[in-house]
Amino acid sequence: TIPFLARVTTQTTQSVGLQVGRLSAISTVGSVIGTLLISYLLIPLAPNTYTMIMVVALEIVLVAVYFLIFEKGFKQTPGVLPGILAGMVICGIAGRVEAVKSPSIGKELFRKNSNFGLMQVVDSPSGNVRYYLNDYLTQNIFDPKEDKSLTVFTYMLRGLTHAYHPSPEKVLCIGLGVGIVPMQLAKEGSTIDVVEINPGVVEIGEKFFGLDKSTFNLHLEDGRYFLNASKEEYDVVILDAFLGDSSPSHLMSRECFESMSQRMENDAVLVINAFGHFSEGEDFFMASLDKTLRAVFKSVHIHDGTRGNVFFVASKKEGLEPHRSMDMSEVHPKLIPFVETAWKNTIDANPESGIILTDNYNPVEYYDSKIREEIRLNFALNMRGK
């Protein structure tokens, strides 16, 4: 861009260096201003699609300005003007389509952009099902009439906590979700610390999912930072940081699990909500997560929900076994068969597959890309009612 602008704006060869320097300075200042605008204005206040449409429209305007100023109009290139007009019309149509677009599964109650994606809350036409979406991908499902979750992982995280620890007095939840799990544990007498990186989900939880943040201690920061800074010790650590189609890889490394281990009592347990498969050729993430946990903890159990949702339980204690069976009395009736399957279906990962994940080498996003695409596709098809 700079060489082209230098050629257009330079009148004599003596001023080439000065003009290039000016253009470079302007470009640098523009990059800084653009980054600040995107980070602090466009991302929080405008959907990503609107931002893309505005950028395209601005580029079309710049083309028009160039021809008006430097080419003295469109007489020499008559085909440019229709192209500019067509581009502006397309931008207008795209903006209109985005404005009226809504999920096909029901009524949109809430829409807001955040630094971590577009957040939406959608009710089904009957009003019996409420969805929390991030970038159009389902993050949680709720029955507002029964005041119960409609996701298996909600019941499994709570159930595994009680099954593997006899009396969880202090619990750390890395990932708030919409607040269902921490609130349940708090009502049962546990002291709860919650670490959540996205403040936007707190607003959603309070408005649409009955979240009462006074029942736990909320820390709005990255989970890894909290682990390194905290001096507290916990009976249970729940890692539920799944977002979109995957979990943050920096929370799935050996170094991160070592930080968690330092925050855990000797008989404490770590409960993880993850997604993946165990079939040959598709088990890199699950096998690697198992190996990485075993590099830090003495006991690891895997509960496979058979539909991609997998739960890991790890402890510094040797010979970890459940103290009791899961209580199904609080599970939504529609989910009891699925929760029972996830509880009873304990499996072992293939020891020949996967690697120990570290901060220095964590290629999960590459090797697990096919699974993540599948998860994203299934979420998208569900949102379209297929």
Model-predicted segments: where are they?
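Structural signature of transmembrane alpha-helices in multi-pass secondary transporters
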Residues: 23-31
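Glycine/proline-centered helix-kink
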Residues: 31-39
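Symmetry-related core transmembrane helices of the 12-TM Major Facilitator Superfamily/SLC fold
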Residues: 52-67, 78-88
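Soluble small-group transferase modules, centered on the S-adenosyl donor enzyme superfamily
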Residues: 74-163, 299-386
